[in-house]
Amino acid sequence: MTDTIVLNDISIGGGAPLVVIAGPCVIEDYDTTLQAAEFLKTVTDRLGIPFIFKASYDKANRSSVHSFRGPGPDLGLDILRRVKERLHVPVLSDVHTESQIGPAAQVLDIIQTPAFLCRQTDFITAVAATGKIINIKKGQFLAPWDITQVVEKARTAGNENILITERGAMFGYNNLVVDFRAIPIMQQQTGKPVIFDATHSVQLPGGQGTCSGGQREFVPCLARAAVAAGADGIFLEVHRNPDKALCDGPNSLPLEQVEPLLTALVAIRQAATEQAGHA
C-alpha cells in the first residue's frame, strides 16, 4: 500500500479511487483549453472519477527549434489560473527551469518535472522545496528501481507529497515499450503512488524527423493494462482534433474516446480491487 497524497477533496494512492489527470499536451489558446477542461470535468463528474486538469505552457523539449512550444509562462499560467477558478478544478503543469518554479507554485496544485530532467538533483530538490505536490516523470532511460534515488532527492527538501509517473522505456531508436512490472516495483520500493501516462507511452520519439510520432490506437490497451497492474491514476493527453494538434497529436486521444475508456478503466479498477481483496 502506498502513501495517500491529498489534494483538496481528492486522495491519490493508498487504495483511493482511480484518479485521472488529463488535458491537452500544450495550451494552444484560452478558449480551446477551457473547452477541453469543461468536457473532461463533465465526463469525470458523470462517472464519479476524481479529475485533475493538465496542460503545458512551455514545451521546452520539442524535437525541433521551430516546433510550437506554447504561450509561455506568463500567459500560460494566467490561462491555467482562469480555468482553475472558473471550473473549480485542480491544475497540473510542468516546469523546465528553476526560474519557472516560483511563479508556477503560485498557480499550480501539482508541479510536474519532465522525464528528461529526472536526474537533475538541484532541479528536483528546488521543485520539491515549494512544498507543492510534485509529479516526477520517470525518465525513459531509467530502470524502475532507480526512481528510488530520484524520490530520495525530493525528500531531502522535506517534501513527502510525491507522485511518480511511468511513461515507457526506450526500445532502440524512436520507440518506447512499457514494462508493467514497473508499476508495482515503484510503488513497493518508494511507497509513493504511481500514475501511468497512457499517451506518452505510445509516442515514437523523434519518429517524424522534426517531431515525434505516435500510435494513439494503442492508448486504450495500455491504459487498461496499467489499471489492472495497480496504477493509482491515469494520465491522458487529449485533443478535439488530434491530427491538427500543435503538439503530440499522434499520441493524443480524441475527446470522443475519453468517456468509453474511463468507463472501462473504472470497471477494471473495481475488479482488480475485489480480486486483491480475496487474494
From Swiss-Prot:
Q: Name one GO biological process term.
A: keto-3-deoxy-D-manno-octulosonic acid biosynthetic process
Q: In which pathway does it act?
A: Carbohydrate biosynthesis; 3-deoxy-D-manno-octulosonate biosynthesis; 3-deoxy-D-manno-octulosonate from D-ribulose 5-phosphate: step 2/3; Bacterial outer membrane biogenesis; lipopolysaccharide biosynthesis
Q: Name one Pfam family in it.
A: DAHP_synth_1
Keyword set for this entry?
Cytoplasm, Lipopolysaccharide biosynthesis, Transferase
Enzyme Commission code(s) on record: 2.5.1.55
Catalytic activity, as annotated = D-arabinose 5-phosphate + phosphoenolpyruvate + H2O = 3-deoxy-alpha-D-manno-2-octulosonate-8-phosphate + phosphate
**Could you name the Gene Ontology cellular component terms for this entry?**
cytoplasm
Localization, per the record, is:
Cytoplasm
What is the protein's major site of localization? cytoplasm
A molecular-function term among this protein's GO annotations = 3-deoxy-8-phosphooctulonate synthase activity
| Gene3D superfamilies named in the record | Aldolase class I
> Which EC class heads this enzyme's classification?
transferase
Concerning its family, UniProt says:
Belongs to the KdsA family.
Matches recorded under HAMAP family: KDO8P_synth
Q: What is the name of this protein?
A: 2-dehydro-3-deoxyphosphooctonate aldolase
* Originating organism: Desulfosudis oleivorans (strain DSM 6200 / JCM 39069 / Hxd3)
Species lineage = Bacteria, Pseudomonadati, Thermodesulfobacteriota, Desulfobacteria, Desulfobacterales
